Structure formats: C-alpha cells, structure tokens
Amino acid sequence: MGLAVKTKKFLARTPLHRPLLELNSARRYRQVMRTPIRDVRTAYCISPYKTGASFIANMFDPSVSAHEPLYHLTLKHMHNPDFLQRRKAFLDLRVEAFGHFAIMAKEFSVLFPDVDLLFTIRDPSDWLGSCLDHAAVMQQRIHYHFGGKLFWRKVTRYASNDFYRLGDEAQCEYVTDMLNFWVRTYRTARTLPKAHIIRLHEVEEKIEWLEDLFNQKAVNLKHAHRNNSPGRK
C-alpha cells in the first residue's frame, strides 16, 4: 500500500474527512457543469447496492468502465437532470455501475430513454445481510458516513450505520424499509423498456451476453472482484 493510499485512509477516519470530501466535490462539480451535454453511449448497471455491480464494472477496461465514479458528488446531485446529463458527458464511459440510481430508475430511464439498464438480482436476505455488514465495516473506516446521510435515509427511517445500535422494533422497521426498496426496484425494472434483469449467480455464465449488451470485450475477469475503478471519490 502506497503512502498516498495510507494517508487517504487515515484522513478518512478523522474530522477532516467531510471538509476534504466537500472541497473535492465542489471542484469536480465545476468541472462537470462546464462540460457540454452530448450523446455518449453509456450503459448502466443500476441494481441496488451490493448486488455485484463492482464485479461487472471491473471486468471491462477501466478506461471505459467504472464503478461508482464521482461517488460523493453524484449522491449529492443525483436528482438533478442537468447534472446527470453533463456528468455522463464528462465521464465519457461505455459501462458504469452505480447501484444508487436504482432509487430513481424510472426517472433515469425517462432522462436517458435510449440507454440500456442492467439489473442484477441477489437473494433479498443475502443482499440485506451484505448491506448491513458493509455499513458496520464502514463505521470503522470513515468518519463521515455520507452514504447513509445522502442515500440510505431516502430508503429507510434510519441511517444505514445505525442498525446494530437500534432496538428490536426499530430494527424490524429498518428491515421492512430495505426489503420494500428491494421489491420496488425490481417491480419498476420490469416496466422499463430498456431494462435487462439477470440473477447475480448467472453473471459469470453470461459474460458473452454482457459483452454484447455493453458492446465491450471483458478483459479483466481474473481481478474483477477488486473494486479498483478510477474516479470513485
């Protein structure tokens, strides 16, 4: 692990985490909003968080594929159509995995009617457990839990990193909210004209189908599970 990575991880656990994120996002926001809107043929994997999106993004060349690029900035402005159009042109990707767009799948489909949208289905109990475990891990790794504040509070009545501190009734409400989100997402996906739905365990069996869908050759299958896409900040 290089010094820059060690420094970044250290700062993420300090009170400097949020101001540094905000400064970086403000700089990137200006860059994005100066980008002219143009047609970029990006296909998206927007199934809910923790459904294999990083694996799918990382199997393709990182020069044309990314997992959750401009992460903090996108969560702040994901309901702004002008930002999303300029962001698409700014990133100039062919494949993007950003599961948080699942919460606005219908609006996303209307904004980009010619774009293919991939949804992967994971068993809901496995998915929920993975989300909870990830939130617990991130509780130890970062000081500012912006994912919970900017996204998960739109899904549940509680921040995602609070689950193991909640009482029994509140935990039941949290689980209900999460599973309702899971159901809504795939019900919506079935109504979208350019949506494609596959089960997570089928992904590695359908590499050629994914290559055709994204019009890209899979080049990185050996290391696809590593979340090493550039630009995830």
For the regions a protein language model found, what residue spans apply to each?
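PAPS-dependent sulfotransferase catalytic core
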Residues: 1-92, 143-173, 218-233
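Short His-Asn-centered micro-motif
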Residues: 45-47, 95-101, 120-122, 199-201
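Short catalytic/ligand-binding loop motif for oxyanion handling, primarily in non-cytosolic enzymes
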Residues: 53-57, 103-106, 125-130, 136, ...
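The conserved 3'-phosphoadenosine-5'-phosphosulfate
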Residues: 72-81, 124, 188-233
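Conserved nucleotide-sensing/catalytic segment adjacent to the nucleotide-binding pocket
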Residues: 82-115
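Surface-exposed cleft-lining segments at the edges of enzyme active sites
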Residues: 89-93, 165-178
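Conserved phosphate-donor/acceptor-positioning beta-strand/loop module used by diverse small-molecule
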Residues: 111-133
